């Protein structure tokens, strides 16, 4: 059992406050550093690290010493796909509760999706998100702005980028209009920012509920065919081919056919990136039978063949990063029949241990897995985080890699508990989360 505690981030650590992290296994996935040593922070920055640091003793001027007890000290996770529901649906989640959940999961930076009420398609809403983050967050809050306004016209992308947007998407819904998508890709290339697509042809998905296949037929439910995803991926890649310097990102990819198209585009030199969720790496349509509406998500859990393709795509680099699509819902929207229940699961507090299953079962190396959770997502949104380097922001976590525990949704910090991973036995526990040099979360074992 662990006692958990949190501290709001505010403006980060005091400028002159120093912290020495000793007896650490320091891992930096980008440089492939993996050493036993120490690390020093001052204010919000990493000052120094190495095997020989503090060999002559820790200076008395150091304000705080944290003994890592040979656990891993690594960059904090970066989740570029979360729904914090604020403004408009604060009964599901808020920036406060969502970021508290992130801190508990070792996630030091999140990117909020813009399908709030109202959407992040105006400067006013963008400013509101930034204000609420400063007031109530435990981690760094970034946001995508909407590609379109409520009337389906193009958002003022230049002003929204200036207001802090790290990219553009209509996630929750696709951009179905090809002309609008082409215009968004064109403008984004001029702004040097990313356009992210929720790839779903609504005519083909046709208000389906789960993957079209064996399980949908067995349960008598309308299915969502995998071509509804791949056809939009194919269309968008065709649209970007004649636009210079454009970056196109596919959210929560789920089908083998989509991956084949993405692989071909990358081989042609196009700047195409994509993400996969932990649940699409570990669950299939069969889990809908076991977990019911807790396994109802969009895109749906697909076949075992698709799942294996996701794992292989992550290993070989076709898939760039892991992101949760953290989608909180209150109980009464999930305790319904499959054909009426809401889509989505929460994922911030299970992101790391579920992803680590791929390491613990020998599928992928630890360094390569952690890369997809740290600097690789940072590269997609162009933020200087996810690395251990001198002068870089001190966004760090301490991880007990082999600690075994059982997921308990009732202990989630998130306001919502909709997860199919309840009672799953996992390995890997976040003991401390440090954001801008400031500890915002600790888990201390009860004796």
UniProtKB/Swiss-Prot annotation:
InterPro entries: Amidohydro-rel, DHOase, DHOase/Allantoinase_Hydrolase, Dihydroorotase_CS, Metal-dep_hydrolase_composite, Metal_Hydrolase. Substrate binds at residues 83-85, 115, 298, 329, 343-344. SUPFAM superfamilies: Composite domain of metallo-dependent hydrolases, Metallo-dependent hydrolases. Its EC number is 3.5.2.3. GO terms for biological process: 'de novo' UMP biosynthetic process; purine nucleobase catabolic process. The active site is at 325. Zn(2+) 1 binds at residues 81, 83, 171, 325. Pathway: Pyrimidine metabolism; UMP biosynthesis via de novo pathway; (S)-dihydroorotate from bicarbonate: step 3/3. It catalyses: (S)-dihydroorotate + H2O = N-carbamoyl-L-aspartate + H(+). Binds 2 Zn(2+) ions per subunit. CDD domains: DHOase_IIa. It comes from the Bacteria. Zn(2+) 2 binds at residues 171, 198, 252. GO terms for cellular component: cytoplasm. Its cofactor is Zn(2+). GO terms for molecular function: allantoinase activity; dihydroorotase activity; zinc ion binding. Keywords: Hydrolase, Metal-binding, Pyrimidine biosynthesis, Zinc. Belongs to the metallo-dependent hydrolases superfamily. DHOase family. Class I DHOase subfamily. Catalyzes the reversible cyclization of carbamoyl aspartate to dihydroorotate. This is Dihydroorotase. The lineage of its organism: Bacteria, Pseudomonadati, Pseudomonadota, Alphaproteobacteria, Rickettsiales.
């Amino acid at each position: 059992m662990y006692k958990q505690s949190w501290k709001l981030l505010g403006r980060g650590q005091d400028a002159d406050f120093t912290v020495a992290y000793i007896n650490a296994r320091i891992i930096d996935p980008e440089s492939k550093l993996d050493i036993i040593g120490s690390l020093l922070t001052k204010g919000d920055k990493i000052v120094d690290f190495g095997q020989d640091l503090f060999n002559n003793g820790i200076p008395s001027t150091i304000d705080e010493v944290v003994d890592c007890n040979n656990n891993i000290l690594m960059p904090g996770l970066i989740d570029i796909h979360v729904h914090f529901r604020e403004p408009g649906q604060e009964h599901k989640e808020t920036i406060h509760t969502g970021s508290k959940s992130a801190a508990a999961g070792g996630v030091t930076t999140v990117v909020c999706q813009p399908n709030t009420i109202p959407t992040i398609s105006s400067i006013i809403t963008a400013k509101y998100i930034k204000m609420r983050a400063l007031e109530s967050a435990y981690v760094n809050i970034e946001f995508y702005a909407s590609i379109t306004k409520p009337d389906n016209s193009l958002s003022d992308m230049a002003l929204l980028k200036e207001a802090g947007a790290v990219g553009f998407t209509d996630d929750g819904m696709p951009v179905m209009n090809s002309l609008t998508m082409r215009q968004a890709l064109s403008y984004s290339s001029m702004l040097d920012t990313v356009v992210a697509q929720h790839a779903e042809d609504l005519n083909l998905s046709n208000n389906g509920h789960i993957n079209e296949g064996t399980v949908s037929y067995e349960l008598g439910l309308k299915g969502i065919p995998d071509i509804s995803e791949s056809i939009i991926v194919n269309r968008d890649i065709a649209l970007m081919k004649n636009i210079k310097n454009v970056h196109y990102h596919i959210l929560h990819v789920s089908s083998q056919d989509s991956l084949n198209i993405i692989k071909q585009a990358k081989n042609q030199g196009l700047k195409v990136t994509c993400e996969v969720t932990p649940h699409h790496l570990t669950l299939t349509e069969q889990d809908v039978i076991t977990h019911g509406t807790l396994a109802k998500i969009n895109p749906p859990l697909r076949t075992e063949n698709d799942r294996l393709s996701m794992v292989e795509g992550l290993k070989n680099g076709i898939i760039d990063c892991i992101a949760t699509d953290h989608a909180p819902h209150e109980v009464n929207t999930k305790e319904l029949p499959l054909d009426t229940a809401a889509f989505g699961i929460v994922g911030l507090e299970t992101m790391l241990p579920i992803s680590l299953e791929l390491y613990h079962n020998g599928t992928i190396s630890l360094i390569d897995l952690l890369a997809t959770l740290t600097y690789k997502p940072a590269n997609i949104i162009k933020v200087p985080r996810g690395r251990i380097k001198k002068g870089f922001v001190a966004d760090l976590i301490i991880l007990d890699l082999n600690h075994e525990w059982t997921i308990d949704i009732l202990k989630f910090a998130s306001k919502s508990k909709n997860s199919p991973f309840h009672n799953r036995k996992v390995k890997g526990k976040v003991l401390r989360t440090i954001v801008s040099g400031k500890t915002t979360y600790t888990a201390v074992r009860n004796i």
